[in-house]
Amino acid sequence: MSSPITLFTGQWADLPLVKLAELAKGWGYDGLEIACWGDHFDPDKALSDDKYCQTRHDILGKFGLKVFAISTHLVGQAVCDVIDERHKRILPPNVWGDGDGPEGPRTLLAFR
């Protein structure tokens, strides 16, 4: 029994999922470990839209790929350091806030 060969999509979050899926198939991968940033996978949308997950499966299926994991670890990297402007690139907009700069997530995360 062989293990599937998968690609983690986080390093390519600047590419649309459909483009990355096409490339991954061409590179010989069996499936993807999908990042929850870029347009690859939105957990909130998955909870609110009954058809959203199927659209992700359909994109991968078009290229004969499967989902093997979903990654949410990027936002967790913001918890150890003092939050500053560098974190804006890794925090989702609802955590970063509405233009409050680093003070927005500091305040929000302090009460969670």
Where are these regions (language model features)?
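N-terminal pre-domain/capping segments
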Residues: 1-112
